Amino acid sequence: MSTTRGVSSSSAAAALALLLLFALCFFSFHSAAAARAVPRDEHQENGGVKAVAAVAADQLVLQLEGDTGNGDEVSELMGAAEEEAAACEEGKNNDECVQRRLLSDAHLDYIYTQHKNKP
């Protein structure tokens, strides 16, 4: 009778190990399938360092192609923002300026209120 109990416990341990292996495989494949690929742009096929912005439903995906940057990307972005601000002060593209300001204000409001406790 002791041999039956030993076989029973070893088969239960094997079944438990098989179940854990199955669960591990399921979750690893499920997480890989849940990840979505970044959209490709037709200009990326040439190579080099290129920035591609793709606007999704609620997010902005910025993809840089190449090994490393030289740090001038942020400076270039800041320069573009300063040029847009100067154009707004001169009165050019008034509708675009108002729309940009409203969007930036709404975005800041969202950032500062998203983690606050609601009454």
Curated annotation (Swiss-Prot):
<feature type="propeptide">
    <location>
        <begin position="35"/>
        <end position="109"/>
    </location>
</feature>
<dbReference type="GO" id="GO:0008083">
    <property type="term" value="F:growth factor activity"/>
</dbReference>
<feature type="modified residue" description="Sulfotyrosine">
    <location>
        <position position="112"/>
    </location>
</feature>
<protein>
    <recommendedName>
        <fullName>Phytosulfokines 2</fullName>
    </recommendedName>
</protein>
<keyword id="KW-0221">Differentiation</keyword>
<dbReference type="GO" id="GO:0030154">
    <property type="term" value="P:cell differentiation"/>
</dbReference>
<keyword id="KW-0732">Signal</keyword>
<keyword id="KW-0765">Sulfation</keyword>
<dbReference type="InterPro" id="IPR009438">
    <property type="entry name" value="Phytosulfokine"/>
</dbReference>
<feature type="signal peptide">
    <location>
        <begin position="1"/>
        <end position="34"/>
    </location>
</feature>
<keyword id="KW-0339">Growth factor</keyword>
<feature type="propeptide">
    <location>
        <begin position="115"/>
        <end position="119"/>
    </location>
</feature>
<keyword id="KW-0217">Developmental protein</keyword>
<dbReference type="Pfam" id="PF06404">
    <property type="entry name" value="PSK"/>
</dbReference>
<comment type="function">
    <text>Promotes plant cell differentiation, organogenesis and somatic embryogenesis as well as cell proliferation.</text>
</comment>
<dbReference type="GO" id="GO:0008283">
    <property type="term" value="P:cell population proliferation"/>
</dbReference>
<keyword id="KW-0964">Secreted</keyword>
<dbReference type="GO" id="GO:0005576">
    <property type="term" value="C:extracellular region"/>
</dbReference>
<comment type="similarity">
    <text>Belongs to the phytosulfokine family.</text>
</comment>
<feature type="modified residue" description="Sulfotyrosine">
    <location>
        <position position="110"/>
    </location>
</feature>
